[in-house]
Amino acid sequence: MIKWKNNRKVFLTAIAFGTMLNPLNSSMISLALHQIQHEFGLSFTTVSWLISTFYLASAVTQPVSGRIGDHVMSRRTLFLFGLVLVAVSAICAPFAPTFAVLIVIRLLQAIGSSAIYPSGVGLIRDHVKERQASALAVLSIFASAMTALGPTLGGFLMTIGSWPAIFLVNLPFILISFFLGFSLFPKEKKKKLRIGDTVRKLDLPGMLLFTVCIVLLLSFLLSLSDGIQYVQGILCLVSAGAFIWWEHQVDEPFIQIRMFRQEKRLSLVYVQFIILNIFFYCLFFGLPSYFQDELGWRVEMTGLFMLCMSGVSIMVSPLTGKWVDRGDERHPVLASAVLMLAGASAMTFFFIPAPFWGKGLVLALLGLSYGIGNVALQAAMLKASPQQMIGTTSGLFQTCRYLGSILSSAVLGMLFGEEIAGSHFEQLGWTLIMISLVGISVSLYFSSMVRGKQTMKKAAGIK
C-alpha cells in the first residue's frame, strides 16, 4: 500500500479540488460575458442567462444529487461521475456552434459540479472521524479562494486564450481530483435496488415538484428589481404547497418536511446561512459597483481591494475549524453574527469618509465575519444532520447559498436601481445593520438550543 493513500491531507485535497469547481465556474464566467455577447451577437440580458441558468441548475441539483448519494449510488461513484460531467462540458464548450448549445453545456457543468459537493461532504462524514470541522474548513478555504479569485483568474485567461479558456482551465483540477479520488476513496458496497425500489427511494414526483418550486422561486426573486411578478409568486406558493402535501403522503420523501420540525437546529442553521449569504453577497455584488461608479476606481484596483475581505476570510477559515473542533459551533456562529453587525455599523458610519487604509480595515472586519460564519455553519450543519441524510442536507445547505445570493440581488435592485451613489451606500449600510440584527437574534436562539441539548446529554450521562 502506498503511504499517501492513507494521508488525510491528500484525501481532503481530492475532495477540495472537486468541490471548488462550482464556485470557481460561478464567479469566473463574469469576465467572459462581454466577449461571448459580441461573438454570438446577443443582448446583455440574453448572455446573462449563462449565470442565471447555472444558479438555477445548481440550486436544484445539489439536494437531488445528495439524495442519490444517500440512497441509490455510492458517494465515490457520484463524486467521480460529477467530475466526468464537468470534464465533458469543459471539452465541448469551445466547439459550441450556437449560444443555445453553450447554455446546454453550461447546464451540464452546473449539474456535474453540483453532484460533487454533497458527495464530498458525505465522504468526509463517513471516513474522516477526527477534526471534521477542520476538514470542512479545507473545503471552505478552497471555495472562498475560488469565489474571490475566480474573476481575477478569468481575466487572466481571457488575455491568453479568449472565452473558451475559462472552460478548459477546469481540466487540470478535474484530472488531479479524479486520479486521487479514484485511488483514495474507499469502495462502498453497491446499493442493489430494483427499478421500483429505486423510483420509490428517489421520490421522483417529489423531486419534480421541488424543482418546479425552486425554479419559480428563484425566477420570482430575480424579477423583483423590475417589480413584483404576482403570477410567478402565486404559482410558486401553489407548487410549494403541492410539494409539502406530497412529501407528507409518501413513506420515503425526497425531503423529510417533518425533519425541519424535529431537527430545529438544522432548520436554524439553514436560516442563518441564508442570512449570511444575503449579507455578504450584497457586499460582493454592491461594493465593486460603488468603487468603480462612485469612486472612479479601475477594475484591477477594485479586484485587488476586495481581497481585503476575501483574503481575511480565507485566512481565518482554518483557525475557525480548529476553534469548532476544540469546543462547539455555538460561539463561532454567534461571533460571526456580532462581527456582521460591527462591520455593517463601521461601513454605515465611517466607510465613506474613511481614508484608503480605513476602508481596507472595514473590509477586513467583514471578511473575518464571513470566514468564521462559513466554516462554523458548515460544521453545525454536519452535526445537526441525520447520518442517513447527510447528502440531501448538505445539498440543501448549498441551495440556501444560492437563495441568499439571489435575494441579495433583489435587495440591491430595490435599493439602487441603475447606479450606486453615496446616499445609496448609506441605505445599504442601514439595510445590512437590520439584516445582521436578525442574524444575531437567530444565532442567540440557536446557541441556547445547542446549550440546552448539551445540558440534557450531560444529565443523561452521554458524551
Spans of model-derived segments:
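Helix-breaking motifs and short loop linkers at transmembrane-helix boundaries and internal kinks
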Residues: 41, 73-74, 94-101, 129, ...
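Conserved MFS/SLC helix-loop-helix module at the cytosolic interface between two early adjacent transmembrane helices
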Residues: 60-97
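Primarily marks hydrophobic transmembrane alpha-helices of the MFS/SLC 12-helix fold
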Residues: 78-79, 102, 333
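A membrane-interface helix-boundary motif in multi-pass transporters
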Residues: 159-171, 222-229, 414-436
